[in-house]
Amino acid sequence: MNQNNAIGSNPLLMPKPRVALLVNLVAPSREGVYKHLATALDLLILHGGMERNRTYWSRVEVNGASGRRIAGWQLSLTKRERGEAFDHWFLHLEPGYINELVRGQPDAVITDEMGFRTLVGLAYGTCFRKPVWVWWGGTLRTERRVGYFRRLVRKVVARWAKRWISYGRTSTEYLLTLGIPRERILQVQNCVDETWYEAPAEPALNLRPRPLVLHVGRMVAGKGIAELLRAAARLQQEGLTFSTVLVGDGCDSTKLQRLAAELRLDNIHFHSAQPPKAMPAFYRSADVLIFPTMEDVWGLVANEAILSGVPVLCSRYAGCAPELFDPECIFDPADEEQFVAALRRAVRGQLPRADKSRLRSSAEVGDLIANTVLASCAPRRSTKPRVEPDTVQDSVVSN
């Protein structure tokens, strides 16, 4: 990005606005976007602690940004469907955001959910007349069973917040149902740091028989892995031969391995979750990625496979599906017959390679957000030197 064009003809007279980014944790996939934001903005990342199901994530440092971990609590919650555990998530409660915003006096705030953290950001923006963006990823599918209290909070946030950033088309559709005007929504695209996948990498696996069918994701019911195993078993009963590799950890890992044994699946391999930068070698081992999620706000594994040149069979319930894939690559994992037919096409090599041009790079997404923030901050900014709070800035890390 041409920073002079973004912040004016004389950047020495117009310093970067300080922008506080409020997040649960610093996700490795966001590293590229955050780096680009930090080139145009004085970026301060305020984050909570590492979630215990993400311990395989490596330390993340965002060049050009400062950051601080906010003390607080994490509540581990289980989402249930039809009386059974469907997924697990963490509720973050970090009251320290209030103090950090008041002391740091950022020129703008970006927050990535519709809960406590966003209410704090909106309160700060209202009291100090600063713009606040809510960065949102939920879809009509993922939010279909939101409870009464969360619906109430979202009504408050939807009326209060005037600026929004959405993960993509399906997230925008959900925001519109909350009564948020389309002109208030900056639609970007959820993305990964593509530089990891552009670098050469030797395949991590050399398995036979081919093709190698890959699944990457947490071992929980909501990811559709049991449905994948049943569909694979039916194809093997038809006489098709292929290898299946599943990469990930989760509370259902033992249960799924037991199911694979009960189905008498051949050539199936389970691998524990890998550090993000190790994943390009796994994608380069694969002939096709199967993404059978029952609900996902986006599905960054699809981006990763596309960048690796691997065809993708994608669930219709993934937020990324209509934006990244043609209809022949999209299926309903809840329909067993449709799943079997789609997986048969994938195993026979009948899926087209996804179009990389549909992906937005981390630079494009970072520039879209930065330019929007700069445009809103320009009339408000002062050329007086900023007085920094008497605190020590930490490196921005994920734990």
State each model region's role.
Residues 326-337, 344-349:
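Conserved acidic donor-binding segment of nucleotide-sugar-dependent glycosyltransferases
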Residues 311-315:
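Short hydrophobic beta-strand element within catalytic cores of glycosyltransferases
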Residues 130-148, 160-163:
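A short, histidine- and acid-enriched strand-loop-helix "catalytic/donor-clamping" loop
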Residues 154, 159-200:
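Donor nucleotide-sugar binding/catalytic pocket of nucleotide-sugar-dependent glycosyltransferases
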Residues 294:
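Aromatic "clamp/platform" in nucleotide-sugar-dependent glycosyltransferases that forms part
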Residues 32, 211, 215-234, 240, ...:
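A conserved mid-protein helix/loop that constitutes part of the nucleotide-sugar donor-binding site
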Residues 16, 257-273:
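Nucleotide-activated donor-binding/catalytic signature segment of Leloir-type glycosyltransferases, i.e.
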Residues 273-274, 281-286:
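Short alpha-helical donor nucleotide-sugar binding micro-motif in glycosyltransferases
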